[in-house]
Amino acid sequence: IDKDCYGLKELPAIEKFGFLWVHPCTDGVINLDDLLGEKLLTEFDSWDFQSLVFANEEKYETEMNWKLAIDTFGETYHFSVLHKDSLFESFHGNCQLFDSFKRNGRLILCKRTIDEMRKLPESEWNICAGSLPVYYLFPNIIFMPTPEGAFLVKEYPAEKSPHKSFSKISFYFYPHVLEQIDQLEKTGVDAKQLLEDQYNGFSSVIQDEDYVAAASSHKGLLSGNLDFLTFGKNEPALHQIGRAH
């Protein structure tokens, strides 16, 4: 590509932890120490994100502000009501751990499988077996590692409107998981349907439950009847996200 013919400008970029970090300014400097902080850098380095393989991406359009979409990932006390027939069957509601790193954060959701895992020696505990880590990366990224791979959620404003947004959901899997799928396919098992089930399961919870409730909340905010909102002590992630913006 002849960059001079297309008006393209080279932006500063680095690849680290399997992520591509790009600065929006041509003379910008990317400093991950400043962006993430030493503790989060160390934590990311302990994972194996760089081996993840991209499998699928979906786009969800919503009638709400993009920040409300991010907020749907920020607490679990609503699980017993909004997700009573879905997530609440696999997760304990109103039970989470949160830590902040600069303008970022990490929420730990408590799976019901932790009840059995806690009976094992601590040396056999696995963070993804008993919980779901949910990383918030300022300003618009939600990243969730799973035993099989990871979900990456990117929220964007749409149509230059504070009342519209869209989400891009990317699904990643570790190579050994995809190899297992291929091996099962060779035996005649429709193993790829297992991947489709993951996509559809995530979509049904996010699109049909979380985003519906958040869009309804957006309409309520537009009424002008609320002068302020109060975040509770069981919503530390929402405190952090609000301060970061």
Q: Could you say what each language-model-derived stretch is?
A:
Residues 1-12:
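Long, hydrophobic, well-ordered secondary-structure blocks that form the structural core
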Residues 12-15, 19-245:
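C-terminal catalytic domain of Rieske-type non-heme iron oxygenases
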